[in-house]
């Protein structure tokens, strides 16, 4: 993103893929690329336009990789993409709602487009299960964390972590 207001992380008007200050690429790009490609496929089908074989392959390969990852990680979608050679991983206790929602959206668009990728249903089911598990329903009436997705709701301290864009991208 353009660093117009974050001068301490780099010169203004330059592009970076890195998280602020940690020298590590932001992991949110991967699910966005998957979802966008799957949606492009779906939109082409809906308009009766030809779908490039490269696009189908891209989406199906992502889907099959995701299915394998979800199985290997005990039913979780990836939430961290470190710098190579370290492989993508699922970091326990670091649910990343917007990434999970985008994996689900991508798999859903792929299904609607007609993908027959091995494991497609499993990817959708895994992402949906994570979203259900991480949805916060408290026993405290009016608590601000009630009805959000959060890896750290902190019900006792009132300092829970929730990001509005999680909800937007999940929906």
Where are these regions (language model features)?
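Extended ligand-binding clefts on enzyme/binding-domain cores
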Residues: 1-168
């Amino acid at each position: 993103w353009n660093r117009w207001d974050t001068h301490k992380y780099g010169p203004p008007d330059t592009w970076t893929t890195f998280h602020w200050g940690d020298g590590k690429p932001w992991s949110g790009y991967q699910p966005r690329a998957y979802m966008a490609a799957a949606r492009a496929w779906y939109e082409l089908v809906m308009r009766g336009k030809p779908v490039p074989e490269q696009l189908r392959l891209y989406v199906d390969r992502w889907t099959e990789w995701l299915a394998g990852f979800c199985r290997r990680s005990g039913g979780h979608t990836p939430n961290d993409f470190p710098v190579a050679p370290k492989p993508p991983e699922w970091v326990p206790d670091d649910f990343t709602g917007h990434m999970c929602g985008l994996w689900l959206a991508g798999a859903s668009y792929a299904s609607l487009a007609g993908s027959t990728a091995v494991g497609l249903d499993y990817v959708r089911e895994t992402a949906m299960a994570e979203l259900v598990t991480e949805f916060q329903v408290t026993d405290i009436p009016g608590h601000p964390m009630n009805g959000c997705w959060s890896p750290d709701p902190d019900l006792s301290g009132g300092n829970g972590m929730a990001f509005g864009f999680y909800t937007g991208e999940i929906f």
